Amino acid sequence: MPASMFSIDNILAARPRCKDSVLPVAHSAAAPVVFPALHGDSLYGASGGASSDYGAFYPRPVAPGGAGLPAAVSGSRLGYNNYFYGQLHVQAAPVGPACCGAVPPLGAQQCSCVPTPPGYEGPGSVLVSPVPHQMLPYMNVGTLSRTELQLLNQLHCRRKRRHRTIFTDEQLEALENLFQETKYPDVGTREQLARKVHLREEKVEVWFKNRRAKWRRQKRSSSEESENAEKWNKTSSSKASPEKREEEGKSDLDSDS
């Protein structure tokens, strides 16, 4: 391994910005692939060669033919362990793997010579989502197994939690008053109320949907309680009837005596 990779200038080199990051491909088959930055929903390398931040950590992914990728590649295609997933966008010279020869600009098409594992076919299929750049110096992405990559994807691509709207007392009072008048207000009524309480019409619509669901649950629970009360009254009356009969019989005997 060249000693220049561990020089002070190489270690302290500034990390390139996300906007300037693309996937580099050097002419040498042994050149490393650099993944220093984060860009959108895909992981890209830095523009340049092996002199970037994390050039020494990642082996260069090579297609089965042994040749490299085109000189300028963008999109969501990423290679691990000689497999490439996602889309391939060729922007520069018509250069490609040995099995394809010269590759013209493909746009969102895929190179048929590059194998894709089962379950990841189709355009836009990406196995791994962006990896935080803080983790890159400590992991060799090229040596991760498929299961590890899927776990990494699940950890990083969790759905963001939506923020819950907090209504004021005045807003809740106005919404509740309108709900008592009508359970299904039209768009004009919702817009008028939204302007009155300084809310968006979408928020008012969502509140009414949730309020109707709560109202249906309360109505269902109250009906179930009334049914249970009726059943309890019937069972209690049936149990008390023999006792009443005994009392009536005793009273009849007393009257005869």
Curated annotation (Swiss-Prot):
The keyword DNA-binding applies. One of its GO terms (cellular component) is nucleus. InterPro entries: Goosecoid-like_HB, HD, Homeobox_CS, Homeodomain-like_sf. The keyword Cell membrane does not apply. Its main location: nucleus. GO terms for molecular function: DNA-binding transcription factor activity, RNA polymerase II-specific; DNA-binding transcription repressor activity, RNA polymerase II-specific; RNA polymerase II cis-regulatory region sequence-specific DNA binding; RNA polymerase II-specific DNA-binding transcription factor binding; sequence-specific double-stranded DNA binding. GO terms for biological process: dorsal/ventral neural tube patterning; embryonic skeletal system morphogenesis; forebrain development; gastrulation; middle ear morphogenesis; muscle organ morphogenesis; negative regulation of Wnt signaling pathway; neural crest cell fate specification. Residues 241-257 have a biased composition (Basic and acidic residues). Keywords: Developmental protein, DNA-binding, Dwarfism, Homeobox, Nucleus. Residues 213-257 are annotated as: Disordered. It is found in: Nucleus. Residues 160-219 bind DNA. It is linked to Short stature, auditory canal atresia, mandibular hypoplasia, skeletal abnormalities: An autosomal recessive developmental disorder with features of a first and second branchial arch syndrome, and with unique rhizomelic skeletal anomalies. Craniofacial abnormalities can lead to conductive hearing loss, respiratory insufficiency, and feeding difficulties. Skeletal features include bilateral humeral hypoplasia, humeroscapular synostosis, pelvic abnormalities, and proximal defects of the femora. Regulates chordin (CHRD). May play a role in spatial programing within discrete embryonic fields or lineage compartments during organogenesis. In concert with NKX3-2, plays a role in defining the structural components of the middle ear; required for the development of the entire tympanic ring. Probably involved in the regulatory networks that define neural crest cell fate specification and determine mesoderm cell lineages in mammals. Belongs to the paired homeobox family. Bicoid subfamily. This is Homeobox protein goosecoid.
